[in-house]
């Protein structure tokens, strides 16, 4: 589809949404309206009119505006009743116009079919001994004598080509060629003989086509239709240019009278034990039914009758065809039509026919009504009870068939189940997606077009965990140990559906309420050459688990009481094995139970309970080891774990902590400790005596109070002898005092009084609670149990004074400015948003960890806080958890991160406003007004526009600015997200047993940078997170020196570099533990010679030979960079130099393995400035000589922590 064209068309039209109720939102109501505004084109005869005399135009009030015609009024009425807005209608109409098949394709298809019909008429009967091609069948074969007989019926178009609903971008035209009845004998329906003859017939026709001059230059390949090894088809790609987008697929079928259809009822057996050399005692056990194999044969036998029904229903009805096109786009975007168990568009086409038969759809229903009615009916359907296209079908017949299949939808003959291979979980998934589509259409607050039709929703983004079994030996072992021998006959010994059924039944029983469903994740089989043997497929399986957050992480499975239900207890023990134990519960009952984790375990460990259950069941029932199975659940959680370099036992020994810390802890598990400490501090603040004013509210506004701090926060704050506080994290708290009319009306005086209040609070805390404190320019620093809190005092008068301006007439006015907005955000709006995000995490426990992974990913890509606001990440993830763009909100942080990557890769930053309506406090009209303001005055909003319901008049402009992030950074992040998604999808859907390593995602590329400034590692503390390494140099020994509270010198210097030199270079660094600063020069035209101007001489030098011109010198810029970096600077080099050094040196060159002298020798300073102290001078330091100089404090207590 041409997205650019659609966007341009949408932008050209000035549109307003009509927020009136949709009276036809449900099933039967859809059927009552007969038009949605789409006027189907009709050929009208041209009627010549006699020339008329020109009439003089009278300029009066009645002739200025022409009244609308009946057609226009009808179109407006239908637009109001059926669509959100005229925009949605135009988008659907334009998409359908793009989807319609061009005449060049239809002409080519008709000509090709005509030539192929002529070709089949020229075929001659004969033996198969002259066929040189491989037979496309790889199952149990029986030696048979087969004589080819030419087709008696001409080939016919089937499927989408016959219905006029071929879908872009690659058109697949299905052709059916019917074998004559004389090719078969009476008992050929038994033991796969029919399937072998069908494959032989296909090989013979293919061989003759290859030798024909008509098709000699075309490409021939075999493939399996719907990944079914019993359904080989020929794929022919024309040699002509049209073959880039068009291919033909040849099916071989049989006439309906070949076999009596009654032989293929679900209860019959058509595969005998002799085929597999099995022994079977018919007196002890009857032959198993082969309902799925029978349906496989019935597909061919009933194809002609079903195709006739489709042709009758669709041909000449553009509304049905377009409605099916809309449904096919929706289904394709969700990948629900792929593989052996896929819900194909063929089923949707038949369902449209069924609804038409039931008079739910009318012949005059428009294309939009067709799609909407199908979704609405599908969302409220129950195919487990059976539906049928056959007029004579009775409920008794359906009840009989239902017992053999998960889902039942009988065809026109009443014998073939169209959903014979569709598992119940896939049908439920389609039903949930249909319900979501209806909900999106009914939501007047959003334009649902992009969510329904445009955005890809791969199945792996809809599941929380993925189970993969890809080893051939493991698959064979599983099939050997499964106890359902009848399945081998039912599926003709095809392994994949047997594994799918076996594993699904086992895991659904074991996981019970912990999951919403188990979905197979399939990929289409690749075609193979007609000269090669058919490949063996079905030797691997991938299952996606959709977790139920309410029960997924329960630590115990309780079984029946042994004294009341002996058989149930025995069955429970047999199912769970040695994991089951007798336990006494608080109610006094003694029951069998399985315990998976302790109640006090970390959330990350509890998220592995489902994994532990699945692996245990596979080991207990099928003897599969952990190495034989890959369970993808929490591979990315490692990025916010505590670094193994940091030893918590030393911290606990030094600080004598009461709480025990686990070395395997992470940021999420450490957060409750901080919140408990904060709650205790809040109680102490409220309990302070003799304060001039009462403290009325206390709000924690740091990310950790909403579970969004990606760095582990440990109780390691230290107060040194000089009253300076050193810590890694400063936790911000905003307090408000009671009302008083004595606050001054001048800003300086008010701030001085605030400082006095903070000093008073600090002294009271010291006196009454024995807490150390220190005053800074930002607020009051309090140390409590090893954590450092920064208390800020909020007063509404301060914001008003910041807005106060006196104009030329002496009149006082109040105008918003950046300082006042920032103060309002920090003191009044952020506490509310922080509380809302905290509540969101309490409702959806995966929210916080998803933010942690996202923040770590952005930081690893050298996107620091100066380029991308951390609050933007938190709000974007919250937007995902608030919007119902998926049937289920994910319970896995890893899946939440994948969905965020998808949002970043697909979002139109320029045209989308991200609204977060916390607690539904925004009225519909307020949202409409904000969206109208955003569309009409887009330039006044930042490139990334985020708005919450607490932002008041600053909505959309509060959390991001024009530079954080700017458009270049947004585009860069979108590209990074697309690349990350490609890596994830490739690894998830591959047959490999190994998932991608986190370092593949969480380490930036070192390509594209012009220079790298290496910084002295001993002056920069490492991140407490698990370090994935630097993109430029190798690992080295880290340091964990504590910085001065609230100071990030490197971030401050980089901010200064950007403010001064952003016109000449872009600067990138890793904000957590980064030891390098990467530089990208701006385009060469920035450094081109320019005219001499006094105010544009920054880093400029005169041009050689032309004193009237100057140009910016990169060497001068580098000297400025080194001057700003001062003590941090070690050396400057290119990425090529670093790569060369890594190859030449075995030792890493990042941390303390390098002698500090080496940094000096390799720096770009003049040699005369290099000091080389002797060993005698390095043993002691004369502190008297250092008095009065700025030095880096290195206290032994801080250093001794690690």
Swiss-Prot record:
State a single Gene Ontology molecular function. RNA binding
- Subunit note: Part of the small subunit (SSU) processome, composed of more than 70 proteins and the RNA chaperone small nucleolar RNA (snoRNA) U3.
Question: What does this protein's UniProt record list under function?
Answer: Part of the small subunit (SSU) processome, first precursor of the small eukaryotic ribosomal subunit. During the assembly of the SSU processome in the nucleolus, many ribosome biogenesis factors, an RNA chaperone and ribosomal proteins associate with the nascent pre-rRNA and work in concert to generate RNA folding, modifications, rearrangements and cleavage as well as targeted degradation of pre-ribosomal RNA by the RNA exosome.
Which GO cellular component terms, listed alphabetically, does the Swiss-Prot or TrEMBL entry include? condensed nuclear chromosome; CURI complex; small-subunit processome; UTP-C complex
Q: Name one GO biological process term.
A: rRNA processing
A Pfam family reported for this protein in Swiss-Prot or TrEMBL: Nrap_D6
> What family, per the record?
Belongs to the NRAP family.
Please give the name of this protein. Answer: Nucleolar protein 6
Keyword annotations for this protein? Chromosome, Nucleus, RNA-binding
Which Gene3D superfamilies does the record associate with it?
1.10.1410.10, 3.30.70.3030
Taxonomic classification: Eukaryota, Metazoa, Ecdysozoa, Arthropoda, Hexapoda
